[in-house]
Amino acid sequence: LQAARRLGAAEDDFSWPLQRALMTYVEENWMRPDNGIWEIRGPQRHFTHSRVMVWAAFDCAIRAVREFGLEGPAERWQEIRDEIRDEIEQRGWDAERGTYTQYFGSEGVDASLLQLPQVGYLAPDDPRMVSTVEAIERELLHDGLLLRYRTDTGVDGLPAGEHPFLACSFWLVEQYASSGRMDDARVLMDRLVSFTNDVGLLSEEYDVAGDRQVGNVPQAL
């Protein structure tokens, strides 16, 4: 909805009421743990990516009021947005390792952290994002492509050895490009495009050793 407004799309009778209804739910439930973007098995946790997404929900609602003149409790939403950000910085940031973590209290990283700049949580070249990308590269790059997270940590009960998840590598391309690493972005983008099948589609994962697509086809994340 926010993207549509910025492109000049007109509000209809349902767009803002729908967003207000969604904000009511988010306001009442944002502090609850969940299973994260990857629907990880096991106990629910406070995933950093999930917290950033609710931060983004409040940020978009605030902007809808202040930039587009819609009616809503922007000051209250701003207080909650700031509270969420404080929690992320206190519990989702590992100062010793210099990286945001997969979930609060975790020592691992997650490729979904690459979406933090995409929703405006911080700039792509922010020092915290740059060091988080470095941690992601160290821990999740496998044959030059990104894993979602390390399954060998036992966080979800899956066996080690998951193939790289292609959408995550495209997120890395965007991060490289938006933070000024254009050469790295071009190299990785060209490699990813080379994996497309005869009708130009990509699967969920890629088996580098077997040089084949694996998982759900097409990938539509």
Tell me what each language-model feature is.
Residues L1-D13, P17-L18, L113-L122, F170-D184, ...:
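Alpha-helical support elements that line or immediately flank enzyme active sites
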Residues L1-I88, D110-Q115, R212-Q213:
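The feature captures the catalytic groove of carbohydrate-active enzymes
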Residues A21-G36, D82-L166, V187-L221:
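Extended glycan-interaction surfaces of carbohydrate-active proteins
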Residues R45-F68, P164, Q175-L192, L221:
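Extended amphipathic alpha-helical segments enriched in small hydrophobics
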Residues D59, S169-F170:
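Residue-level signal for cytosolic alpha-helical hairpin/rod architecture
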